[in-house]
Amino acid sequence: MAEAGGGNASAPQKAPDKVVSGRVTDTAGAPLVGVNILIQGTATGVVSGSDGGFSIRMPEGRDNLIFSHIGYVSQTLPSAQTRLVRLVQDEQEIENVVVTGIFTRKKESYTGSATTITSGQLARVSNRNVFESLKNIEPSLYIMDNTLMGSDPNTLPDMQLRGITTFPSESTGVSIKGNYQNRPNQPLFILDGFETTAEKVMDMDMTRIESITILKDAAAKALYGSKAANGVIVIETKRLAGNQELVTYTGSIEVSMPDLTSYNLCNAWEKLEAERIEGVYTSANPQTQVDLTKRYNALKAQVLGGLDTYWLAKPLRTGVGHKHTLSVELGDSRKLRAMIDFSYNNVAGVMKGSERTVLSGDVNVSYRKKSFLFRNILSVSNTRSDNSPWGDFGDYARMNPYWSAVDPQTGQIARWAYDEVANPMYDATLGTLDRETYTSVTDNFYAEWQATEALKLTARLGIAVKRSDADEFYPAKHSKFATSAYESTSMQLRKGSYQLDNGKSSDISGEIYANYAKNWGRHYLYVNAGGRIAENTYSAYQHYAEGFPNSQTADITFARQYAQDKKPVGISSITREISFLGTASYSYDDRYNVDLTFRESASSLYGADNRWSSAWSAGVAWNLHNEPFLRDQDVLKQFKIRASAGLTGNQNYDTNEVLATYLYYTGATYHGQTGAYLSKMPNPALKWEQRMDYNVGADITIHRATIAFDYYNSVTENMLTDVAIPTSTGFDTVKDNLGKVRNRGIEAKLSYTLWQGKQGFFNLFGSIAYNKNIIINLSESLKAYNEKMMAQAQDKSNSTPVLIYQDGMPMNAIWAVPSLGIDPTTGQEIYVRKDGTLTYEYDAQDQVVAGISDPKYRGNFGFAAEYKGFGLSATCTFLGGGQRYNTTLVNKVENVDIHYNVDRRVLYGRWQTPGQNAMFKKLGSYTDENGKQHDEKTRATTRFVQDNNELTFSSLSLYYEFNPRLISKIRLKRLKLAFYMNNIATLSSIRIERGTTYPFARSMSFQLTGTF
């Protein structure tokens, strides 16, 4: 008998852990690498390997596995069902990741400030172009209305992210059409991991876009080092996802209607009355008075007879454009997949003959072999921009309504509207040509090797080539040549002009990165290291010719000669760069997160003494919602606090600023030899412009409400500035690094889901961005620039504020002389001197900062709803806190030439008699009763600086997506109908003409999408 407790006693044995193995793929059957597989209720897990396979030991009592991967819907499955796991990509999941263009990170562990916009969000706002959608979604990206060019489809918008960062660059003296390079405040654009241009983004087919990520603070954008100071916009196109052969067609018709609500011009009777009041038909000379009375009576009879030409409508139309996209998806989904896209987009502007036509094709091929992935995207596009032959819209706004647009005898468009006043409509009948075209070919190759479960190597090679041409032809009969300067016989032969521009550019870049990602227990480590090398070349040439007697000879080879005193000119540049990048991210228990980035870059853009520059960032984040004391509750779903600091650079500048560039003397020789001279003073010590960013923020989700908040403080230093130097050097200025500018701001977003169900949702949203810009350290070297601006302001012919820079003031400050209004006794304006005394004499030295042209805050609000396939969304945008100088009141009321049409406010509010309280003084240019000519133009005064607050109903969309079961009977997988309206209405606190060269437009479009 064995003793109690003896070694032969039978004890319960622990059951051995079972091993669960399986494979994870996407819906197309392609293996997913790096999927996190976690045993539910524990911190134990593994990561799927290069073929999507995994193997994990399951302890006793545990049976469920959680599968999660960036951009895919997480799944929890019992171990018995994990032999083959398919993860589904979800648009909502895309919002929870950050695509940087170099790697993709979970938003929960990301420390940077970034906004991700999905294709669905873009489509709910507009189907016109990317910038139209971004303008209505993200207020921190300020896409400015162009008050001159309005809704011209061929004008690229200006934009800035989190304020102005640099002084505007002075012109090189050669203005090449179609050259949109070196806009100093423009963000960097990344398309599928490669740099691209804003013009390319504007012409993109929006149906190709999967997501857009805007990188704002240093922790987010320091990846791009010396190019990231202005922010980075990362665009990802749609990846191949299906395992079937699919054909998708999207077609739309867009209707654009002119918006002339900002114009307040006189009709025929009002204009005639304004002329009478201003004394146009009054003279002290009796004989002259008789002639003036006859003229007035004749015009009055015509007006009473019904002559009232609405000139604004003459060059306009309701533009009808159309867009078509065909996408074909084919191939073996497990190894070789391909997607081919064809797109045609015709944008018809509201001015007759104004169009932008884009024809593009893309081939996306993906091949996977075991642990290797190869992807190549070839894009070819051709864009043709036709500017309206009807000329400048402002010319029509000047025409008197009592002038006839057509010859009353023949009914044809008259060459002269009145006496020697040219009819702008006539120019459109002559064969005028103003066209730009460009063709671009881009090939982006991507290779990936999943060496181990944790180590991945990636490589990119991108090649882009662009060729652009521009033709501008004006026949001899054009109104440009209907002046006394062309009356002589020799000048007659010079009538007609042609400007021909040719440009080409090429970009080649290569990148290689290694990244290591490892999960162990509660720890997660991600390390990425690599480098980039790139070269960009650009050249453009411009030719002027004249002498085209025949309007049908719209070709420069028919010119009589080169334009007088002109010769072919051009610009060229070449930029080379190399950089090395290292990033590291660490996360503990999904609670504490740290991101570190360092990039060392060298560029030929800057001086030989300062080729290299460093960019860095450090970011931390704390996920409070994952703390034990907040984990077991359902109300607070997310509460992340983050902070970052870092340094980035800007190089949106002319490449020849630091090079010793020489030009040849073409007009003389010395002993048969041609001499050369230095065209500009080089500066080998020129440094990188740098921006130091500090950012704190929070991301909070409480029940159905999502809140995001950011506060930032950015200081830009080493700003490139034209510095005055002694003329004994042979130059007036040289580029140098001087001055600092600070931008401080707050951004806040709120989204609230009122209702969410299986059949739909109803969501409210709103956001606001506030920015304050100020110059904090301005060098004395800019004193010469300010003196030049002050001299311009003192010029009696100048009526608009000039740009003056001063410490403690915003960069876009509006400078004007203080005004107390119009003296009721004399009708003259009363100015306030710097010493506080009053005067009638204008002195530009008395100017003060009267306002800021940039709005202090911008934002949007609206809703998005869907129910049983029906969707409705609306967005309003607003801005305020800034000021504008009302040029309409100056140019169309006070400084107006009364012989052309004027603003209706000329009829009232103008001082006429002593004792009258008036808003406006008497006419600036006039002839008194004694026949003496007066020209007392209104200058820049605070009287015309007005608060600028706007509310715009910017977007409305309605769509219906058919039930898949219903349309499957006709072999359709998807069918969607949509209707859009954009720029519907604008309410403004300031009455000013908008779109003075090209009018603004309201648009609506109808879209159909079908997948077979």
Residue ranges and their predicted role:
Residues 2-40, 64-73, 80-123, 131:
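Short, acidic, small-residue-rich periplasmic hinge/interaction motif at the N-terminus
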Residues 6-11, 73, 110-179, 189-222, ...:
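Periplasmic N-terminal accessory/gating domains of Gram-negative outer-membrane beta-barrel systems
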Residues 125, 137-160, 167-183, 187, ...:
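Residues embedded in well-ordered regular secondary structure
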Residues 190, 297-343, 410-450, 564-583, ...:
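Outer-membrane beta-barrel transmembrane strand signature
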Residues 248-302, 542, 736, 753-853:
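Conserved small-residue
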Residues 303, 386-442, 476, 480-499, ...:
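Acidic/polar loop-and-plug regions of large Gram-negative outer-membrane beta-barrel proteins
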Residues 358, 364-382, 420-474, 490-800, ...:
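Extracellular/periplasmic, surface-exposed regions of secreted and cell-surface proteins
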Residues 480-482, 562, 603, 879-976, ...:
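Extracytoplasmic gating/loop element in the C-terminal half of outer-membrane beta-barrel translocons
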